[in-house]
Amino acid sequence: MPSTSSHPDRPLRAVVMPPGPQLFAAVRDALSGDGPAVLPLAPGQEAAAIAALRPSDVDGRPLEGGSGVPADVAVVIATSGSTGAPKGVMLSAAALRASAAASLRRLGAARGERWLCCLPPSHVSGLQVLVRALLSGTEPVVHERFDPERVLASGADHVSLVPTQLHRLVELRADLSVFATILLGGAAARPGLLDEARDLGARLVTTYGMSETSGGCVYDGRPLDHVDVKVGDDGRIRVAGPVLFSGYRSGEPVPRDGDWFVTSDLGELSGGRLRVLGRADDVINTGGEKVVAGAVTTVLGGHPEVADVAVVGRADPEWGEVVVAVVVPADPSRPPTLAQLRAYCADRLPSYAAPRELRLTPGLPLLPNGKPDLVRLRSQI
């Protein structure tokens, strides 16, 4: 299971530490030859401290055998945990390869073209960049930290980004046509950002997927080859195909509808194109009405004075929950008011879905994969 010191320690241990001892592979030290390749991950050990471990910190005692995974599992990926505790998703090499091959076919990417990886390989989006490069017969260009100017000068043909990274490229007003393709995944992007990037020459492909589908399985609303998508009567998106995962590391049941994996996302299909509405477990119950937080986020993201936004529910004795908009202003000296945002929502959303509270912030707390950390946001309000 690939990991990073930026993973939250406690929820990460819940994923990687079922009964039995575990090991932590210090890949950087192993490759450079100046440290141990494998270190024990002890209960209570903080992930940030693991990176600082050296041979003198390891007592060398042999470890007893721990719990294993099925033979076909190539990697265990921790989900982002954007709305709750992360899960360990078991992926086979066949699933990873099926996803990467379908992606290359859809993009028309030729063998020998290079991929830039500036997403954490501990997340499925970053890992799949490496797999696509492998299938392309090239060595990936890897940037451990995101530097917009280095990204533009990387010489790579394709790159996978999250909206926050794309926003930083757009701020430079640089020529984005240097990439044959920019895959955009993670959190939903505000409509204005996509338009601004395309005006700068970006050839954008928006993606939908998750760890359980080996990454993006729907490009620009249409499923990849050999992937089937439908929406059930409950509004949840279902996915079938060779890209699906083998199960959860913890052994918890996989939500299924026959051969279909039932996601936690709500969506609608029109003309064979999928539109993602938001997460089913991110619904705000206010005054007896159900509000999909993702739908409100999408609308508010189109306001010209909003640079970034997240929508969460806050417990309220009168309404049960109230809709709270956490906004990063486009111009901090002239932030939008609650009245302006509610007026903007008036002809775009039902009245009960408009935010009742506004919190201004210089930046949203983000997870390593670029998604807003909604658990942390809820705790802050």
Predicted regions and their residues:
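Conserved pre-ATP/AMP-binding loop-to-beta segment of ANL
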Residues: 12-14, 18-19, 61-78, 108-114
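ATP-dependent adenylate-forming carboxylate-activation enzymes
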Residues: 17-21, 38-53, 138-155, 188, ...
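AMP-binding/adenylate-forming
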Residues: 52-58, 90-169, 181, 205
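Conserved AMP-binding A3 loop
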Residues: 73-101
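Gly/Ser/Thr-rich phosphate-binding loop
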Residues: 169-223, 228-230
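Conserved ATP/PPi-binding loop(s) of AMP-dependent carboxylate-activating enzymes
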Residues: 223, 232-259, 279, 291
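AMP-binding/adenylate-forming catalytic core of the ANL superfamily
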Residues: 241, 264-353
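AMP-binding/adenylate-forming catalytic domain of the ANL superfamily
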Residues: 350-371
